[in-house]
């Protein structure tokens, strides 16, 4: 999450999502998150991981992401390098809390650490601000797989709210 550390980031433009990009966005997400899930799985109790991902993390992510792309396309933006999608984001608005949320942020592996996530977040901040919200939230995991995401959000000025989740098998 480094601002413009690579000349490629200067050639990135943000554009609205449209359905013809669906498969490319889904493929990018799986490539971006494969190493995250590989590091996350051993850090999560096995019964929790199995319940969340009974058919594998890829199937769950594809289903969840497809629902966002189909149901909230007006809140999805792409970072494009020419005709190639370098990353994407989706936001949600929570007017009851005067808060926007960066619900999804994914960068293609070949564009990571080149400022793409920063550009997407800045665009999301502007969309959320324009909607009249006073703050923005992002959630991520506390496991080793999400370490880079935590660094990215902290470097963008996000402050953590300590939360604990506990699980018990029945």
Model-derived features with residue positions:
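Extreme N-terminal starter segment of soluble prokaryotic enzymes
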Residues: 11-13
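Short acidic/polar active-site loop segments enriched in Thr and Asp
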Residues: 134, 159
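Intrinsic-disorder-associated, low-complexity terminal segments enriched in Asp/Asn/His/Tyr and depleted
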Residues: 4-6
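Acetyl-CoA-dependent GNAT
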Residues: 16-103, 108, 121-122, 127, ...
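Conserved beta-strand-loop-alpha-helix junction that forms the acyl-donor binding cleft
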Residues: 112, 137-149, 167-170
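Conserved active-site tyrosine of GNAT-family acetyltransferases
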Residues: 153, 158
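Active-site acidic-Proline motif in GNAT/NAT acetyltransferases
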Residues: 93, 108-114, 145
């Amino acid at each position: 999450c480094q601002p413009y550390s690579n000349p490629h980031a200067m050639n990135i433009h943000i554009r609205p999502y449209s359905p013809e990009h669906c498969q490319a966005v889904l493929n990018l997400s799986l490539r971006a998150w494969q190493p995250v899930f590989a590091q996350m799985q051993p850090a999560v109790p096995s019964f929790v991981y199995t319940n969340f991902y009974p058919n594998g993390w890829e199937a769950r992510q594809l289903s969840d992401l497809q629902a966002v792309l189909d149901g909230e396309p007006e809140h999805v933006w792409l970072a494009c390098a020419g005709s190639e999608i370098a990353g994407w984001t989706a936001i949600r608005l929570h007017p009851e809390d005067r808060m926007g949320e960066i619900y999804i942020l994914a960068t293609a592996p070949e564009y990571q650490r080149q400022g793409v996530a920063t550009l997407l977040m800045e665009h999301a901040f502007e969309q959320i601000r324009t909607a009249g919200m006073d703050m923005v939230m992002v959630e991520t995991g506390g496991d080793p797989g999400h370490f880079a995401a935590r660094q990215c959000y902290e470097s963008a000025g996000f402050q953590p709210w300590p939360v604990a989740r506990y699980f018990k098998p029945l």
